[in-house]
């Protein structure tokens, strides 16, 4: 997810997306621990998406 796509979302949608990504990251970590994870790059993608969402939320909070 790109930063422009994230800024187009409302705050509630961003928080919901962040929650979804955190759940996905949790599941991916379990898959990695059990050796079932095939696409290991997905871990960093999800972490970066969470960081992007948090960054946009923080920017909006500072602009208010």
UniProtKB/Swiss-Prot annotation:
Any one cellular-component term (Gene Ontology): cytosolic large ribosomal subunit
PANTHER family cross-referenced by the UniProt entry: 60S RIBOSOMAL PROTEIN L35/50S RIBOSOMAL PROTEIN L29, LARGE RIBOSOMAL SUBUNIT PROTEIN UL29C
Name of the molecule in the record: Large ribosomal subunit protein uL29
GO biological process, one term: translation
InterPro entries: Ribosomal_protein_uL29, Ribosomal_uL29, Ribosomal_uL29_CS, Ribosomal_uL29_sf
PROSITE patterns for this protein: RIBOSOMAL_L29
Superkingdom of origin: Bacteria
SUPFAM superfamilies, sorted: Ribosomal protein L29 (L29p)
Alphabetical list of CDD domains matching this protein: Ribosomal_L29_HIP (cd00427)
């Amino acid at each position: 997810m790109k930063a422009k796509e994230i800024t187009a979302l409302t705050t509630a949608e961003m928080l919901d997306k962040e929650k979804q990504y955190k759940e996905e990251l949790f599941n991916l970590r379990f898959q990695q621990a059990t050796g079932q994870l095939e696409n290991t790059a997905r871990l960093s993608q999800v972490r970066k998406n969470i960081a992007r969402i948090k960054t946009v939320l923080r920017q909006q909070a500072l602009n208010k």
